[in-house]
């Protein structure tokens, strides 16, 4: 119940700042706190670098979780700037490798510092990226970042490819606000920027991408700050950060905006210079199609 009430407050407080990003006021309000709808439970241990961001003053991991992130270096977690804006390092703990929030027995690692992108805009959610420094290095293997480059230096296109999004967000908003204890995943196609620009006032920048379904797919993003990952050479790499979406309704699936990881490698390397980066793919600039779990209507 604590988490339910907290979630409703977060959704309500997020709406005014972003409501103007929707071209048609009759459309559902934009919200920063995103959801996984129509996805499936993730297998235990499948995504070891996933991280749950927790309120430090709440001893219950399930109710304390407010955003997600990923371990990209032994001491650094990548997340969305809007997740940690206005928060102190002392107010956050991180559960790396969490799966079932009600049965998490690992360490709740205190945070040493928070690094928000200096050009982050809380209204447009441009540059929605931040780094959280752990006070104790993690023993878990970090995820590799997608470089967004090909062997011939032609930027590869994510358009039409499936990204897998992870989180503990709302699993059902049609009849009730149901937050799952267990990590969930969903596969979403990356769509053309113009498709999202038909909905949002603030256009999709090159430092972002748009993904999701339309009409009847119950498709939303994962928890804010969580990862959108793709496969490169058989390995999962981090391609985007869950940033902004619109409220999910019973018969509508909405496209969400993601911060494009490859656009911020310089920012990331300021603090995590040895982060692993990959993504050199064959000439032609395309990623292989991946047979992933699809949403059900």
What are these regions (language model features)?
Residues 20, 51, 65-85, 92-93, ...:
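C-terminal subregion of chymotrypsin/trypsin-like serine protease catalytic domains
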Residues 24-28, 102-104, 109, 129-215, ...:
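Chymotrypsin/trypsin-fold serine protease catalytic domain
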Residues 47-61, 137-145, 189-224, 237-247, ...:
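Active-site region of chymotrypsin-like
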Residues 29-58:
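N-terminal activation segment of mature serine protease catalytic domains
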Residues 4-13:
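Sec-dependent N-terminal signal peptides
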Residues 15-19:
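Sec/Tat signal peptide C-region and signal peptidase I cleavage site
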Residues 24, 29, 53-56, 77-80, ...:
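Conserved H-D interstitial segment of serine endopeptidase catalytic domains
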Residues 58, 83-85, 100-101, 121-123, ...:
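Solvent-exposed loop/turn segments at secondary-structure junctions
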């Amino acid at each position: 119940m604590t988490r339910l009430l907290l979630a409703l407050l977060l959704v309500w407080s997020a709406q005014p700042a972003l409501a103007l990003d929707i071209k048609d006021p009759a459309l559902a309000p934009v919200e920063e706190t995103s959801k996984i709808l129509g996805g499936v439970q993730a297998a235990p241990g499948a995504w070891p670098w996933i991280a749950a961001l927790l309120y430090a003053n709440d001893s219950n991991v399930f109710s304390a979780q407010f955003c997600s992130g990923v371990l990209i270096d032994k001491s650094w977690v990548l997340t969305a700037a809007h997740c940690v804006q206005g928060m102190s390092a002392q107010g956050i703990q991180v559960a790396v490798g969490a799966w079932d929030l009600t049965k998490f027995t690992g360490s709740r690692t205190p945070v040493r510092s928070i690094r928000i992108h200096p050009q982050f805009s809380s209204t447009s959610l441009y540059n929605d990226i931040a780094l959280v420094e752990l006070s104790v290095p993690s023993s878990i293997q970090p995820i590799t970042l997608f470089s967004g480059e090909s062997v011939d230096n032609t930027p590869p296109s994510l358009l039409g490819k499936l990204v897998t999004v992870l989180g503990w967000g709302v699993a059902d908003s049609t009849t009730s606000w149901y937050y799952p204890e267990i990590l969930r995943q969903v596969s979403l196609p990356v769509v053309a920027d113009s498709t999202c620009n038909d909905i949002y006032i603030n256009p999709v920048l090159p430092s972002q991408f748009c993904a999701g379904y339309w009409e009847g797919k119950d498709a939303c993003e994962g928890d804010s700050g969580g990862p959108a990952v793709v496969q490169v050479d058989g390995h999962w790499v981090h391609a985007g950060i869950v940033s902004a979406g619109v409220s999910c309704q019973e018969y509508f699936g909405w496209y969400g905006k993601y911060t494009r990881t490859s656009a911020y490698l310089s920012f990331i390397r300021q603090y995590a210079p040895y982060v692993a980066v990959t993504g050199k793919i064959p000439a032609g600039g395309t990623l292989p199609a991946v047979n992933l779990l699809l949403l059900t209507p």
